[in-house]
Amino acid sequence: MTPAIDLLKKQKIPFILHTYDHDPNNQHFGDEAAEKLGIDPNRSFKTLLVAENGDQKKLACFVLATANMLNLKKAAKSIGVKKVEMADKDAAQKSTGYLVGGISPLGQKKRVKTVINSTALEFETIYVSGGKRGLSVEIAPQDLAKVLGAEFTDIVDE
């Protein structure tokens, strides 16, 4: 199916797969997923990649609710670097093996530091991309962190 799904199956992590018809004209991928799946946007999590200290070859991954904005200062602090900036589209796609709008935190080509916003812990399960547009994975946040080697911290604007 996708590297994300393959990883979850291989690691025997419980998850539920959800599909929906992606509108190619919609560029608000996380919002679209929440709307089409009929879930609270605070449970629909997006995957963002940043460049550490401006180096587009040294990326880190942040997973946060689609309703939130990533705070770059908090993000940098959470991974112990001076500053971060959003990774460019090509660098993100090359590092993950996924297209923008379908980037999953799971099964990326290159393993990178990953941080999940602490609001994920408010829910029994959250939704993340399954590795392509129109495919979402419902998973317990603790299981997601375990398989990614990720930490939970506050990385969003107030």
From Swiss-Prot:
PANTHER family: CYS-TRNA(PRO)_CYS-TRNA(CYS) DEACYLASE YBAK (PTHR30411:SF0), CYTOPLASMIC PROTEIN (PTHR30411). CDD domains: YbaK_deacylase. It comes from Haemophilus influenzae (strain ATCC 51907 / DSM 11121 / KW20 / Rd). Changing residue 47 to A: 21-fold decrease in Cys-tRNA(Pro) deacylation activity. The keyword Cytoplasm applies. The keyword Lyase applies. The gene is ybaK. Its EC number is 4.2.-.-. This is Cys-tRNA(Pro)/Cys-tRNA(Cys) deacylase YbaK.
